[in-house]
From Swiss-Prot:
Its EC number is 5.3.1.9. This is Glucose-6-phosphate isomerase. InterPro entries: G6P_Isomerase, G6P_Isomerase_C, Phosphoglucose_isomerase_CS, SIS_dom_sf, SIS_PGI_1, SIS_PGI_2. GO terms for cellular component: cytosol. GO terms for molecular function: carbohydrate derivative binding; glucose-6-phosphate isomerase activity; monosaccharide binding. The keyword NAD does not apply.
Length: 557
């Protein structure tokens, strides 16, 4: 890439004006034309960083657009904002907190970066590692003396989505334990997951992790209370049972103690860790239980590698910055306000759901840091599914619908090796299946970009309109050399920093979530009525009153 930071940085308005002009110049240019105009386009618009490769050549940009986007990043002081992120500054200004999730992956031996905080982090991680090794060795026993063989993580949001996603993604790296060990996840407040799960478990051999930053989330505590009653019914109601069957992860040791969790079973967080950024902390206990201590450390190392890349690489070769800038171009200049995440590997089944929270809870904001309303669109709708399944669900809309959609295609270069084969005779067939997934990944991104031009001349001849493809849907392709703990750490941290880049360009705070809070308060007003502890419906709107009457069996219909 040929971009060099200008000697004179443009103002924000100059950078935006230049990009608007470039939009007018390029908006009618099809991706087919971009590629025919530049035979070196892939080399120009792709970046490799250790185990990650980003191909962004199928975006509707040319070199001038990329230069203009980098100018905008400089005009918005992105360099300074990155420095502010990697500091003690309270950039989460609405909650008066720093945003220091990156500190969770600083290596213990690095004494140059906030040594006191690094020491605190590693004290808790070492406590978690000791617990993991004890469970793996079959030395952690329940109240009756039997070895723990099932661990249930009870959490919601960041205490569930991240650990669930990573645990599933790294299923090939599950460690061998002294006795079989299974990890389960429960999040829904309606009890349906618990109802299904408890029938499969034995109280004597089950350990529960109550994972809640505030230790006040009703979803989590209601599930925790249900399993407590289940345990106490089988094993007796005493502190001995609680001590052997519950681990707590929270910023609130006093609340954990009040609930009954023994101090030695409490793993601590800090207010400067946002829930959706917390899988690197002891919230990641289910991950460590699955992949082992070494696997968890590799996950942290991969994220740390991207932290360093994000802080040091020029913007035009900086993967998180590039992904963020391309999203802004699509969203704010090309008016593409929906983004699909399409991993071509079943192990990344929960990755799109994880990114929905990471991106939409972070950047789904309409108020600037100045307190004024934003004057442009912020976070697009993020959605997705494992690619091969999605091809049979919603790709019809991507190819021939009326909505403009940008996509991220994600795939590992290598899938299977000798360690992954249960039976040697499966090897050839499984590798062929991986190649089938890769061929579909490349084919779909090609067809979305080039439309009819991706077809042969024979196919196009006399092709009815309902079989034609317009193309021109932009996409990135992200290749992992292999899906392993290190590369997954890199991938997740890349998206974390993408979110931050976009928040800077939109001038919003990505680390709070006030839109979530009020609904919980209103639910607390409704619960006493549904529990028949109150009966005054007059303060509610007509719709809510009507629905409450049906739920209470008071309707006259």
């Amino acid at each position: 890439m040929n971009y060099k930071q200008p000697l004179i940085v443009k103002s924000q308005q100059q950078a935006l004006s230049a990009l608007r002009n470039l939009k007018m110049q390029t908006q009618d240019t099809h991706l087919n034309q971009f590629f025919s105009d530049d035979s070196g386009r892939f080399e120009r618009f792709s970046v490799e960083q250790e185990q990650l490769v980003l191909d962004f050549s199928k975006h509707r940009i040319d070199q001038n657009v990329l230069n203009g986007l980098v100018d905008l990043a400089h005009a918005q002081d992105l360099t300074q904002w990155i420095q502010r992120l990697f500091s003690l500054e309270e950039i989460n200004y609405t909650e008066q907190r720093a945003a220091m999730h990156w500190a969770l992956r600083v290596p213990e031996q690095n004494q140059q970066v906030l040594p006191e905080i690094t020491a605190q982090v590693h004290t808790q991680l070492e406590r978690m590692y000791s617990l993991v090794e004890k469970i793996h060795a079959g030395q952690y026993r329940g109240a009756t003396g039997e070895v723990i063989q099932d661990v249930v993580n009870i959490g919601v949001g960041g205490s569930d989505l991240g650990p669930l996603m990573v645990t599933h993604a790294l299923s090939d790296f599950k460690v061998v334990t002294a006795k079989p060990l299974d990890v389960h996840f429960v999040s829904t407040m309606d009890g349906s997951q618990l109802s299904d799960l408890l029938h499969q478990l034995r109280p004597e051999t089950t350990l529960f992790i109550i994972s809640s930053k505030s230790f006040g989330t009703i979803d989590t505590l209601s599930n925790a209370q249900t399993v407590r009653q289940w345990l106490e019914k089988a094993l007796g109601k005493n502190s001995h049972v609680l001590k052997h069957h519950f681990i707590g992860v929270s910023t609130k040791p006093d609340k954990m103690s009040e609930w009954g969790i023994a101090p030695e079973n409490q793993l601590l967080l800090w207010d400067w860790v946002g829930g959706r950024y917390s899988l690197w902390s002891c919230i990641g206990l289910p991950i460590a239980l699955t992949v082992g201590v070494d696997g968890f450390k590799q996950l942290l190392s991969g994220a740390y590698a991207i932290d360093q890349h994000f802080q040091t690489a020029p913007f035009a070769q900086n993967i998180p910055v590039l992904i963020g800038l391309l999203g802004v171009w699509n969203n704010n200049f090309l008016d593409i306000q929906t983004h699909a995440v399409l991993p071509y590997d079943g192990r990344l089944k929960y990755f799109a759901a994880y990114l929905q929270q990471l991106e939409m809870e972070s950047n789904g904001k309409s108020t600037q840091r100045s307190g004024e309303k934003v004057d442009s669109a912020t976070c697009p709708i993020v959605w997705g599914e494992v690619g091969p399944n999605a091809q049979h669900a919603f790709y019809q809309l991507l190819h021939q619908g009326t909505h403009k959609v940008s996509c991220d295609f994600i795939a590992p270069v290598k899938r299977y090796n000798a360690n992954h084969f249960t039976y040697a005779e499966n090897a050839e067939a499984l590798i062929e299946q991986h190649h089938l997934a890769l061929s579909n990944c490349l084919a779909q991104s090609r067809l979305l970009a080039f439309g009819n031009q991706a077809l042969t001349a024979d196919e196009i001849e006399d092709l009815p309109t309902y079989k034609q493809y317009e193309g021109n849907q932009p996409s990135s392709t992200i290749l992992l050399k292999e899906l392993n703990p290190y590369s997954l750490g890199m991938l997740i941290a890349t998206y974390e920093h993408k979110v931050f880049v976009q928040s800077v360009l939109w001038n919003i705070n990505p680390f709070d979530q006030w839109g979530v809070e009020k609904g919980k308060e209103i639910a607390n007003q409704l619960l006493p009525i549904l529990n028949r502890e109150q009966d005054d419906l007059s303060t509610f709107d007509a719709s809510t009153q009507g629905l409450l009457k049906i739920l209470l069996g008071k309707n006259n219909g």
